Amino acid sequence: WYDFLLYGITAALVFNREFFPQISPAMGTLAAFATFGVGFLFRPLGGIIFGHFGDRLGRKRMLMMTVWMMGIATALIGVLPSFASIGWWAPVLLVTLRAIQGFAVGGEWGGAALLSVESAPKNKKAFYSSGVQVGYGVGLLLSTGLVSLISQLTTDEQFLSWGWRIPFIFSVVLVIAALWIRNGMEESTEFEQQREKPVVKKRLPVRS
């Protein structure tokens, strides 16, 4: 959630100037928030695709993939050249990376919630699954706090030039930590039992 929400915070402060300077400030802000919305459009698609393969290949494997996708997309935003450097390719690449973020978080949300419920004791399933929602708040606090800290430690010119990029690149640290944690996880017992069951293919009746 840190990566996904960080984009929205920075879009309001920087992206209208860095990636949409060719239009008016008001329209640039609207364009920046429009790219923010792209992530939400791709979330359902990510949930469907990762959910489909998660039922066949495992929740853990899909969650490892979503972390990789989210981390790489976020870090690349942190090193993405501005409109002044590469022209229209800058906003095009920004939208593409935002779409990848949305696609990844769609799979992350459903997969993490499902794994939490399946791995929890029978009398604590609701409590364990609430951790997914808690992660949203933690990500919001961390992203907001880091952007605020860097903006206080830099001048306006420095923040617009390179300071805003630091929280995005910092995502690499969080990705490494998340991969280390998830590598030690095990698939839920429910999934393992379901995978061991023989698959029965039902034939559809053919009308004469």
Outline where the language-model segments fall.
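Central cavity-lining transmembrane alpha-helices of secondary-active solute carriers
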Residues: F33-H52, R61, T66-A75, V138
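Symmetry-related core transmembrane helices of the 12-TM Major Facilitator Superfamily/SLC fold
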Residues: S161-L179
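C-terminal ends and interior cores of transmembrane alpha-helices
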Residues: P21, W68-G87
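Flexible cytoplasmic inter-helical loops of multi-pass small-molecule transporters
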Residues: N183-L204
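Extracellular/periplasmic helix-loop-helix junction of adjacent transmembrane segments
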Residues: A11-L45, L63, F83-V92
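Glycine-rich segments within core transmembrane alpha-helices of 12-TM secondary carriers
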Residues: A104, K124-S151, V173-L174
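Cytoplasmic helix-loop-helix junction between adjacent transmembrane helices
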Residues: G87-V134
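Helix-loop junctions at membrane interfaces in 12-TM secondary transporters
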Residues: A26, V79-T96, L153-L160
